[in-house]
Amino acid sequence: MGKFLATLILFFQFCPLILGDYSPSCCTLTIGVSSYHSKPCNPAQPVCSWTLDLLALSADQALQPPCPNLVSYSSYHATYSLYLFPHWIKKPNRNGGGYYSASYSDPCSLKCPYLGCQSWTCPYTGAVSSPYWKFQQDVNFTQEVSRLNINLHFSKCGFPFSLLVDAPGYDPIWFLNTEPSQLPPTAPPLLPHSNLDHILEPSIPWKSKLLTLVQLTLQSTNYTCIVCIDRASLSTWHVLYSPNVSVPSSSSTPLLYPSLALPAPHLTLPFNWTHCFDPQIQAIVSSPCHNSLILPPFSLSPVPTLGSRSRRAVPVAVWLVSALAMGAGVAGGITGSMSLASGKSLLHEVDKDISQLTQAIVKNHKNLLKIAQYAAQNRRGLDLLFWEQGGLCKALQEQCCFLNITNSHVSILQERPPLENRVLTGWGLNWDLGLSQWAREALQTGITLVALLLLVILAGPCILRQLRHLPSRVRYPHYSLINPESSL
């Protein structure tokens, strides 16, 4: 009896710890080698929420696809709508019918290989009637281009489901598994809502290693650069490995396929190598060879210098430019006035020559008319002499000739206005105003000078300020810390 009571007391003492350690506090979504924790959820708080990026999910699934020869859809397009297909571990009986809605289809069972499908048909084994998920109660999601928000009821956590994009001819499928789990005691490194401890924490905390590398980088640049870390998925991370350490020939499981792997035979780290990299398959494997280090892409950028407070303009430069502009305007006005005066005199001389030519042509025309009258008079006299033979033309047995002189062109030439009135010598406006020629030209010159002065006052300070800040706007090149062509 005493042993039973002691056992019962120990059970009640450790029961809260056991229940607290294994009671689920969230739902973990797994795709490829990456996992994403939902916001805290449990039977009392049954809504489990995720905020995901479809491009990152595609990169994670490419590391460990659910089916061989998967035809992936790399460039996600905004015009393609997203659909959700729940899956079940045990395929239910098919009795026909099933739940159907615009953003949700009937549950299907995963079947390889993918063949490509559209959203309104079940892509694998066809629709089933029971069990099914209700779209609003069990699962719902919102989509903004490649950003996805999923809300899943806690009772459905533990079942896999897939996301489908309506793109005929492709299989843009993301196959996701869910299981109840506990939130990690500390925040995951770098990637939010992702449990990467099984890859990044083989020995000492991985975050301290990254901080040590950042500190060494800052010291090497004498704290003149900024270290920028790219918060991306594991598929875009880099690996430094030592080719001097051999990899065991025993079979091992690939854990990560990095986007860049660089050999570093002469690199000395402040700590030991943490992972095992196999150069033959270009992947991080599970063997404990410790010849590599995983790190995210990070780059160096120069520290921007603080510039002095910019003034509106330099007064000396403004007045200097204004004086130069005014001098140029005065010189241009005087030159223009002189050219206008010389042009006026030239037009006057040309007009005099034209009038003299016109008078000469008119006199010649009048003389020609008199000659024509004399010829007509002689013709009439000869016709009277040869009246008996039938006239002069019949007596000569020739065709009669007549003189036709027109006066229209000479009339048009006399009616032409003076050349000075037909040629524009100013701005093409009526600047008469009852003033003399020099007064009109002086008025035009003054208006030109005022317009130039206003233009310099308005645009001069802006142009000078832009010229002063032009050297400080030269961009510095972006240097990557990991350069494939550099010798580490």
Curated annotation (Swiss-Prot):
Residues spanning the signal sequence: 1-20
CDD domains: HTLV-1-like_HR1-HR2
Region (Immunosuppression): 376-392
Effect of substituting G327P: 85% loss of transmembrane protein cell-cell fusion activity
Outcome when changing V330A: 30% loss of transmembrane protein cell-cell fusion activity
Keywords linked to the UniProt accession: Cleavage on pair of basic residues, Coiled coil, Disulfide bond, Fusion of virus membrane with host cell membrane, Fusion of virus membrane with host membrane, Glycoprotein, Host cell membrane, Host membrane, Host-virus interaction, Lipoprotein, Membrane, Palmitate, Signal, Transmembrane, Transmembrane helix, Viral attachment to host cell, Viral envelope protein, Viral penetration into host cytoplasm, Virion, Virus entry into host cell
Outcome of swapping I334A: 90% loss of transmembrane protein cell-cell fusion activity
Cytoplasmic-side segments: 464-488
Cross-referenced InterPro entries: TLV/ENV_coat_polyprotein
GO biological process terms on file: fusion of virus membrane with host plasma membrane; symbiont entry into host cell; virion attachment to host cell
Sugar-bearing residue positions: N140, N222, N244, N272, N404
Residues forming coiled coils: 340-385, 397-429
Annotated TM spans: 443-463
Motif CX6CC positions after renumbering to this chain: 393-401
Residues where lipid is bound covalently (S-palmitoyl cysteine): C462
Mutagenesis / variant outcome for changing G329A: 25% loss of transmembrane protein cell-cell fusion activity
Region (Fusion peptide): 313-333
Entries under PANTHER family matching the protein: ERVV2 PROTEIN, VIRAL ENVELOPE PROTEIN
Oligomer status and interactors: The mature envelope protein (Env) consists of a trimer of SU-TM heterodimers attached by a labile interchain disulfide bond.
Other observations noted: HTLV-1 lineages are divided in four clades, A (Cosmopolitan), B (Central African group), C (Melanesian group) and D (New Central African group).
Protein name per Swiss-Prot or TrEMBL: Envelope glycoprotein gp62
Origin organism lineage: Viruses, Riboviria, Pararnavirae, Artverviricota, Revtraviricetes
Name of encoding gene: env
